[in-house]
């Protein structure tokens, strides 16, 4: 049996990709934090004055296609471009999209800017993730820890962006109109988001050759015939032998099995931006002394927990106990923890019910219920998302690595649709019932995934 030599620490290329992704996520989440406000605010208030229903529909299509285009960008990178060039094209295109939103400040500029962001994300997103996986040999247990570190970069950008962009739009560049209304500096928020993307690209292009070597410089479709047999074959890390086509197909089938479970996880998790956010706005006591915390600020709680907890998870996955946990078990536990998180929201509903009329917006539940929900959801996320990214790079044949990474990211697209339907039942069923059903369903899914552990491992052919 071939044993993969384990090394301590991580290659410096990981930290280059960490900062590149951090600035890209800063750019994206900074723009996303103000997009719906920019669409719906009146022109005199710094917005475009769109109808709210149309704006929500446009927002949904935008975020949906952001998760769809990586399928195309991943295929182009694998077949023609190479991952490094695809990341550069994607980054520059997204930067131009942000600058278009800033420069034109019109409906035409909006559509052009959003289109550039959608296209750019398609090139960037799947390929930078597969570059992380390419830093490690098959069977290297550091890979899960590496994706946890990488995931911390994603959330560091996501945490900082709404705070920085909020100051830019609401304070630094906000002005008062003659009628006393405020004109927000949303276009300057897009400018700062574009500058963030520019910083990420400068770092990536200046240091890429030094810290990544020739990783991702060639598309699989461009390698020589002699190299094709080496590049396109997957290896069983337990035996050191090449996998045949049947075994590779079984590995790919595992990606789709885990994707189904991931859809249900994210459908529950994404309630943070819909049903949980609305419940927080109406029924959670957000006051600390005389200060009331803006509802939007709670979108930074999850990234804050990610940045805080990710180093601990990195150490845990690298520990003897962590190395023994298989991917299905990790992800199953993550789903169960998500379900437990919703129990705290059920507790918030119960507190309000005990205090009086549940429809009275003055009847508030304690803030701690919400914080505990976000904490447990974050722990569940750390068991699902970086582990999922890692296992896709392990299971994918090299010739399909970026495409299958893009397929994995489609789980978020489907989850947002499912999550929207779930959230729509809050008005008729009540928040408590919806939270109860989510908690029960995702927990059952988690238990089922753990029970399927042995079956799935057989299909993974040496990957754990």
Locate predicted features.
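C-terminal ends and interior cores of transmembrane alpha-helices
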Residues: 89-110, 336-359
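Short amphipathic helix-loop junctions that connect adjacent transmembrane helices
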Residues: 33-56, 274-296
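Intracellular loop-helix junctions on the cytosolic face of multi-pass helical membrane proteins
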Residues: 1-16, 137-141, 166-290, 313-323, ...
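Conserved MFS/SLC helix-loop-helix module at the cytosolic interface between two early adjacent transmembrane helices
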Residues: 69-102
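Hydrophobic core of transmembrane alpha-helices in multi-pass small-molecule transporters
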Residues: 22, 97, 108-124, 354-383
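Central cavity-lining transmembrane alpha-helices of secondary-active solute carriers
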Residues: 56-77, 159-161, 300-313
């Amino acid at each position: 049996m071939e044993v993969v030599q384990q090394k301590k620490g991580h290659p410096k290329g990981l930290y280059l990709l960490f900062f590149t992704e951090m600035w890209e996520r800063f750019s994206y989440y900074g723009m996303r934090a103000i997009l719906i406000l920019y669409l719906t605010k009146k022109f005199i208030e710094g917005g475009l004055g769109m109808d709210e229903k149309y704006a929500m529909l446009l927002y949904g299509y935008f975020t949906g296609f952001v998760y769809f285009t990586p399928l195309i960008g991943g295929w182009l990178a694998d077949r023609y471009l190479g991952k490094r060039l695809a990341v550069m094209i994607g980054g520059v295109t997204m930067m131009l999209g942000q600058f278009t939103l800033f420069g034109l400040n019109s409906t035409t500029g909006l559509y052009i800017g959003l289109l550039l962001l959608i296209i750019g994300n398609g090139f960037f997103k799947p390929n930078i993730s597969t570059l992380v996986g390419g830093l490690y040999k098959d069977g290297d247990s550091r890979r899960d820890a590496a994706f946890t570190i990488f995931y911390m970069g994603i959330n560091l950008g996501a945490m900082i962006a709404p705070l920085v962009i909020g100051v830019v739009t609401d304070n630094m560049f906000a002005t008062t109109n003659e009628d006393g209304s405020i004109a927000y500096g949303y276009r300057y928020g897009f400018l700062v988001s574009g500058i963030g993307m520019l910083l990420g690209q400068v770092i990536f292009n200046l240091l890429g050759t030094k810290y990544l070597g020739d990783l991702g410089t060639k598309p699989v479709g461009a390698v020589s015939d002699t190299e094709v047999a080496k590049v396109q074959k997957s290896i069983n890390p337990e035996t050191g032998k090449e996998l045949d086509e049947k075994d590779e197909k079984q590995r790919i089938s595992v990606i789709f099995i885990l994707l189904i479970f991931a859809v249900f996880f994210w459908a529950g998790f994404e309630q943070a931006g819909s049903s949980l956010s609305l419940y927080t706005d109406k029924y959670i006591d957000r006051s600390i002394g005389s200060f009331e915390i803006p509802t939007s600020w709670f979108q930074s709680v999850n990234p804050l927990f990610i940045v805080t907890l990710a180093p601990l998870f990195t150490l845990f996955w690298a520990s003897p106990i962590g190395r023994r946990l298989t991917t299905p078990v990790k992800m199953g536990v993550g789903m169960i923890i998500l379900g437990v998180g919703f129990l705290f929201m059920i507790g918030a509903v119960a507190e309000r019910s005990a205090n009086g009329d549940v429809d009275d917006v003055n009847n508030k539940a304690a803030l701690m219920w919400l914080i505990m929900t976000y904490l447990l959801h974050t722990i569940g996320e750390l068991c699902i998302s970086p582990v999922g990214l890692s296992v896709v790079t392990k299971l994918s044949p090299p010739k399909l690595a970026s495409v299958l990474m893009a397929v994995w990211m489609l789980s978020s697209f489907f989850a947002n649709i499912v999550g929207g339907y779930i959230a729509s039942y809050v008005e008729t069923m009540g928040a408590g019932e919806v939270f109860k059903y989510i908690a029960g369903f995702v927990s059952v899914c988690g238990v089922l995934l753990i029970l399927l552990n042995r079956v799935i491992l057989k299909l993974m052919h040496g990957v754990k």
